[in-house]
Design a protein with these regions (language model features):
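Helix-coil boundary and interhelical linker segments in multi-pass alpha-helical membrane proteins
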Residues: 1-13, 68-78, 121-127
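N-terminal signal-anchor transmembrane alpha helix
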Residues: 10-30
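Non-cytosolic membrane-interface motifs at loop->transmembrane helix junctions
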Residues: 11, 104-112
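Structural signature of hydrophobic alpha-helical transmembrane segments
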Residues: 17-19, 75-86
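Cytosolic, membrane-interface loops and tails of multi-pass inner-membrane proteins
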Residues: 30-49
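Core segments of alpha-helical transmembrane spans in multipass integral membrane proteins
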Residues: 47-70, 84-87, 91
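Membrane-helix boundary connector in multi-pass membrane proteins
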Residues: 72-73, 91-107, 125-127
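Small-residue-rich segments of transmembrane alpha-helices in multi-pass membrane proteins
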Residues: 109-124
């Protein structure tokens, strides 16, 4: 595939992934209990909500950083970023599995996300 044809796909996917992480972060900040349930490990109603706020802030920051890199750096920089942040959904897969979440959520959401992020890194490195 020619680089000219590949660039919109690679950058488009990077933008979608980054915006999705911004959305997840905002959701954890605004409706933390619902966001935790969607993550695959429901939060205890009497639990410490500070951890959900921390997750929301970190996800929001990761998403905004991704968008900034897309806007102001090279494809290689964005590719390295995607390669590194793929560790997050891989770790999320293990967290869900070790804390009573379903295999469907662990692999269908988190592991699948890691695969898409790694695929995006490969597309960006190819530019």
């Amino acid at each position: 595939m020619e680089k000219i044809m590949l660039a919109p796909l690679a950058y488009g996917l990077a933008v979608v992934l980054s915006l999705f992480v911004v959305f997840i972060g905002a959701r954890f900040l605004l409706v933390p209990q619902a966001a935790a349930a969607g993550y695959g490990v429901p939060a205890r109603p009497d639990g410490d909500t500070a951890y959900l706020t921390v997750k929301g802030l970190k996800d929001l920051t990761f998403g905004l950083l991704g968008l900034a890199l897309i806007a102001f750096t090279t494809a290689d920089a964005v590719a390295w970023y995607m390669l590194i942040v793929a560790l997050v959904p891989l770790g999320d897969t293990l967290i869900v599995l070790r804390n009573g979440g379903t295999r469907a959520v662990a692999f269908g959401i988190h592991f699948a996300t890691a695969v898409v992020v790694l695929l995006n890194a490969a597309l960006l490195f190819a530019l």
